[in-house]
Amino acid sequence: MRPPCHAQVWVKSQYVCPNCGVHLAIGAYYRLSTVLDHGTFKELNPDIAPNDVLHFPDYQEKLAAASVKTGLKEAAVTAIGRIGGVQAVVAVLDSRFFMGSMSTAVGEKSHVRLSMLPTSTWPLIIFLPAAGARMQEA
């Protein structure tokens, strides 16, 4: 997807077109690469995936399409890394995957992530460009 002006330079300006000002979606891994110190990223729970507990029509196909489009299994990416030398737990919802909506997998990743904090002095930083709860898993 490109800005309406068809500029090719938007990646260098953090997904904001310098010609027309259109903001494009930033993926979770790109956002983490701009926030975490180089070489400190370690993903938490990369294998947690959504459940189709309600057997919602076409949900599996939509999940597969979102996965192909984004390279993600789920909207949430959770990680540990350093920001300015300070160890932190970071979570990012990727708005390109079901508009960053929250599923059972996002809840599970959040629980695992938050369960690390009581025994830690690490800050928790969450990026939430989300649309809310996912109706297919209500």
Predicted regions located by residue number:
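Terminal-region recognition feature
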Residues: M1-A138
